[in-house]
Amino acid sequence: MTTIKLMHAKLHRVRVTDAKPDYVGSVTIDSDLLEKVGILPLEEVQIVNLNNGQRWLTYVLPGQAGSGMVCPNGGAALLCKKDDILIIWANEQCDRAEVLENGHKAKIFVADENNHCREFLYQILNPNQGSVEFHSLPVIPEGKTSEYLQQMIETNKI
């Protein structure tokens, strides 16, 4: 069995709301954001700071639901400052043969300046004759179908 590591969840362009160097390691994230993409408390995540290029590996602690909180703790707090923009993602080990046979789906939360959902995507690997095809599909907000599609067309996203 050959295993591969695939991204299964990503919080894209979230804004740092606080940084606590004296707190014991980790990153504290609004539990609603974690639930939306399927990242579990204590799950290992990788983080890149888009403001300075710093990268690190840590684990997640759940923060207050609905707060928009993204707070690197411990040593990671020295790699960023309030209002920096981060990409946070979690990977999972997958059996390569199963991915080629059944595909794979990752959830992507794209944040606005307040860490609310600006866009939500599924990035999908669809099986195709021993290989996979990659697709990135926006989830259309309920009741916004024509407005949302028009916006996507105008911004050249579809």
From Swiss-Prot:
Which Gene Ontology BP annotations are present? alanine biosynthetic process; pantothenate biosynthetic process
Residues at the active site: S26, Y59
Q: Which Enzyme Commission numbers does its entry carry? A: 4.1.1.11
Which InterPro entries does the UniProt record give?
Asp_de-COase-like_dom_sf, Asp_decarbox
- Cofactors named for this entry: pyruvate
Q: Does the keyword Lyase apply?
A: yes
Task: Provide the reaction this enzyme catalyses.
Answer: L-aspartate + H(+) = beta-alanine + CO2
In this UniProt entry, the residues modified to Pyruvic acid (Ser) are S26
The keyword Lyase is annotated on this UniProt entry: yes
GO CC terms on record?
A: cytosol
Q: Name one GO molecular function term.
A: aspartate 1-decarboxylase activity
Recorded hits in CDD domains, A to Z, give: Asp_decarbox
| Family under the similarity heading | Belongs to the PanD family.
| Record note on quaternary structure | Heterooctamer of four alpha and four beta subunits.
HAMAP family per UniProt: PanD
Give the protein's recorded name.
Aspartate 1-decarboxylase
Q: Which species expresses this protein natively?
A: Trichodesmium erythraeum (strain IMS101)
